């Protein structure tokens, strides 16, 4: 999902035009490169992160994420964007600070 009307997600949850939590399942609206997008830490996203970071289990993933490389950040951002509904997210051009904020927002929403 990129751009478009963010007044409704199609899943019964209101979407925030400024970013922030937008759904009961932990979705978060973020702005990446001036485009509103949705991130969500799903079970599938966690599995993708484990695979992409070549770690086994959540504890190992959490430890690895304490010091992410740029490649690692791309893996994690793409996973949470797919969790938010995107099928082929293009993340290579996203600024690192925006990427880190989006990833943090997805994890924070999942922890609530």
Predicted regions located by residue number:
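Short, surface-exposed, charged amphipathic helix/loop patches that serve as local interaction elements
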Residues: 1-25, 43-112
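Short aromatic-centered micro-motifs
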Residues: 30
């Amino acid at each position: 999902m990129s751009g478009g009307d963010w007044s409704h997600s199609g899943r019964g949850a209101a979407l925030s035009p400024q970013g922030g939590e937008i759904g009961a399942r932990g979705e978060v609206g973020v702005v990446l490169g001036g485009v509103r997008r949705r991130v969500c830490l799903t079970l599938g996203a966690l599995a993708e992160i484990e695979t992409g970071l070549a770690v086994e289990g959540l504890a190992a993933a959490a430890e690895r994420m304490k010091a992410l490389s740029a490649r690692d950040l791309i893996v994690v951002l793409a996973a949470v964007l797919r969790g938010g509904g995107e099928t082929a997210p293009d993340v290579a051009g996203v600024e690192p600070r925006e990427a880190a904020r989006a990833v943090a927002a997805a994890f924070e929403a999942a922890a609530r």
